[in-house]
């Protein structure tokens, strides 16, 4: 009996958040260990089903770095990173698109549907949803910078009661294909949709200081200080920059959470203390 009462109390503690966030759009960047470990993958899918059932409109943007690395290695194609971004030549671009749009996207969509969600997998190239140009004059090869998001494609899917699962591949002005950093892709989509939240699942606790302690709340000033002292560097830079762009564009809050923690998404959304870092 006591266990049942405790369960009821836990459910009721989430009620204010369910009421607050019903019918709101949450853009969720899905990547890291949560996308690899079988138990975490299933936990994530169940979390998304719950969000859908309580009326939160989830939009999922996924990465796939580890699987891309694996396929590139099999084909003897090298992986090079500059400023946390994958340098992508023409051969690598074909592998990236095949892996993201053809394999990973459909795996995620199928898993969500298996657990009772209604999800549809799409590429950013579909209906020219994501338009892009070469990032930094081709410094990174076929890595692109999003220039426009056709939000009507996404809203049509959402309004039909479906969850869009988006591969971060975009189309250029000459119909060339671009690889988009998944964090930056999620940021651009959240900004165009004016989402209530954008949430980045990662393999770290959140934003850490130089002593590797979690910082629960940040703003632009504190982020610049962390960049200057080196606490934010490497692959964390595009993630943080993506968060800041969201906030400047009208997104309510940006969260970075540890995807290795079971049900981290629910813990961040439906509890007072959360588990990661929030940027406002």
From Swiss-Prot:
Domain of life of the native organism: Bacteria
Primary location group: cytoplasm
Metabolic or biological pathway: Amino-acid biosynthesis; L-arginine biosynthesis; N(2)-acetyl-L-ornithine from L-glutamate: step 2/4
InterPro entries in the record: AceGlu_kinase-like_sf (IPR036393), AcgluKinase_fam (IPR004662), ArgB (IPR037528), Asp/Glu/Uridylate_kinase (IPR001048), Glu/AcGlu_kinase (IPR001057), NAGK-C (IPR041727)
Gene3D superfamilies per UniProt: Acetylglutamate kinase-like
Residues reported to bind substrate: 64-65, 86, 179
Catalytically driven reaction(s): N-acetyl-L-glutamate + ATP = N-acetyl-L-glutamyl 5-phosphate + ADP
Keyword tags: Amino-acid biosynthesis, Arginine biosynthesis, ATP-binding, Cytoplasm, Kinase, Nucleotide-binding, Transferase
EC number: 2.7.2.8
GO MF annotations in UniProt: acetylglutamate kinase activity; ATP binding
Cell location: Cytoplasm
First-level EC class: transferase
GO CC annotation: cytoplasm
GO biological process: arginine biosynthetic process via ornithine; L-arginine biosynthetic process
Site (described: Transition state stabilizer): 29, 239
Cross-referenced PANTHER family: N-ACETYLGLUTAMATE SYNTHASE, N-ACETYLGLUTAMATE SYNTHASE, MITOCHONDRIAL
Family: Belongs to the acetylglutamate kinase family. ArgB subfamily.
Name under which the protein is recorded: Acetylglutamate kinase
Source lineage: Bacteria, Pseudomonadati, Campylobacterota, Epsilonproteobacteria, Campylobacterales
């Amino acid at each position: 009996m006591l266990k049942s009462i405790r369960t009821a109390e836990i459910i009721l503690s989430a009620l204010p958040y369910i009421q607050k966030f019903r019918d709101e759009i949450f853009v969720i960047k899905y990547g890291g260990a949560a996308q690899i470990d079988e138990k975490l993958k299933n936990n994530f899918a169940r979390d998304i089903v719950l969000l859908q059932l309580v009326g939160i409109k989830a939009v999922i943007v996924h990465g796939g770095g580890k699987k891309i690395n694996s396929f590139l290695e099999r084909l003897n194609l090298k992986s090079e990173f500059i400023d946390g971004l994958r340098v992508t030549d023409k051969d690598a671009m074909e592998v990236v698109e095949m892996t993201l749009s053809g394999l990973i996207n459909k795996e995620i969509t199928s898993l969500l549907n298996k657990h009772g969600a209604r999800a549809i997998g799409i590429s950013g190239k579909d209906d020219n949803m994501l338009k892009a140009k070469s990032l930094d004059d081709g410094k990174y090869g076929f890595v692109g910078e999003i220039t426009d998001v056709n939000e009507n494609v996404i809203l049509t899917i959402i309004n039909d009661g479906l969850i869009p699962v988006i591969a971060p591949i975009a189309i250029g002005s000459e119909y060339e294909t671009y690889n988009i950093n998944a964090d930056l892709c999620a940021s651009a989509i959240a900004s165009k949709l004016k989402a209530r939240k954008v949430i980045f699942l990662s393999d770290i606790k959140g934003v850490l200081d130089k002593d590797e302690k979690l910082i629960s709340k940040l703003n632009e000033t504190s982020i610049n200080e962390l960049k200057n002292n080196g606490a934010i560097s490497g692959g964390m830079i595009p993630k943080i920059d993506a968060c800041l762009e969201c906030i400047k564009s009208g997104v309510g809050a940006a969260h970075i959470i540890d995807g290795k923690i079971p049900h981290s998404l629910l813990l961040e959304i439906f509890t007072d203390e959360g588990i990661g870092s929030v940027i406002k």
